[in-house]
Amino acid sequence: MADFRIEKDSMGEVKVPKEAYYSAQTQRAFENFPISGIRFNSAFISALGYVKFVAAKVNEELGLLKKPVSEAIQRASKEIIENKFDGDFVLDIFQTGSGTSSNMNANEVIAKRANELKSGTDIVIHPNDHVNFGQSSNDVIPTAIRIAAVISVEKDLIPSLRHLQKTLLEKGKEYKDVVKTGRTHLMDAMPITIEQEFSGYARQIELGVERIESSLFRMLELPQGGTAVGTGINTHSEFGKRFAATISKETGYSFIEAKNHFEAQATVDAPVELSGQLKTVAVSLMKIGNDFRWMNSGPNSGIGEVELMALQPGSSIMPGKVNPVIEESLTMVCAQVIGNDATITIGGQSGNFELNVMLPVVAFNLLQSIEILSNASRNFADRSVQGLIVRKERIESMVGKNPILVTALNPLIGYDKAAKIAKTAFSENRSVLDVAREMTDLSESELENALNPINMTKGGFSE
């Protein structure tokens, strides 16, 4: 028995795998683009399902699709939304720049499944004439990008980042009374508490969420209804507005029709903006992850201020070695997101006249950035921050010998004399307090008050 069937399109006959739900145009694209094996993720496929579901519903309401046809398309599209047919979305992301191949992939899968599900009609549901009615790849794909990104950010990324922010604040509060050596240029500086340092990390994440939320407002404008070039040719004049209202009801997010369809289809400025904010979050996480690696370094020959969770052996040759694997995973994710942003930026420049022609690569990289940032942020919170232990005794011993503590004496004895004390303390491996007793006329109480590390974390002048 043959393992393929014959399908026809406007260009002729094509052999298609027998069990596949896609048809001729998808098969042609599959053969044309054997590039990377990278396919769209489930979020994008689900978004295509939403577009087709809502389009069928709205076109029925407008009297443009018969009810049995619309209902069958809606039922099939629901299964796409639920990712039941992800295996039939077989196309490489490096394909036609409009994403037409992936739009037709959705149209063909939904048409075949709708014909299986239909009742009350003898009409053969067609990928173009029914599933794609009143639509073009040029508004479907940009719309799907926005829907997928908004849902993924709201459902996954923002909750993960807020969880990380909360975890950082809680860990800082757990060690709020621990004073450590601050560092600038990787060199000893004035003291800071663990809580203060971790509050800075948490604020980075909080601001990242705010930046992302701000950029989402532009992502809520949907190109759907513009069809081929933004004029709305071959669709109802109310389609775009009704589509936005219906998709909002279906998803729970406040989508609106694009204020200008020519901008919405000719550019991907909104996705480029969102990617830029994702890059900023990646930069923040890279800094935090690297700080954790430095604080954990050693444990004997490095800074060794904290002890991260021992999750797996770190070396195939050195027994007992444990590495900061979660931080390394996190920082690699950050590097990928930063690289994705560069790709998206180049993609955004490829909007020639009325259409961007790098939509698939923009879609893939944007959604990958959202996905891996979501997963890495939560993993970092749960498998690193929560289990972090501060090595109090080591921190206290290092703070006591920090020559930069002498900075607190500047208002009392002047910069030059304070510098001499710092140099002596460092060269003789003594505490600043011990040297200051010999080199100043300050009383013991004055010195102890001025050189108390906890007092230095509260700002102001020494008294």
Task: Show the residue positions of the predicted features.
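Conserved, well-structured ligand/cofactor-binding cores
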Residues: 1-463
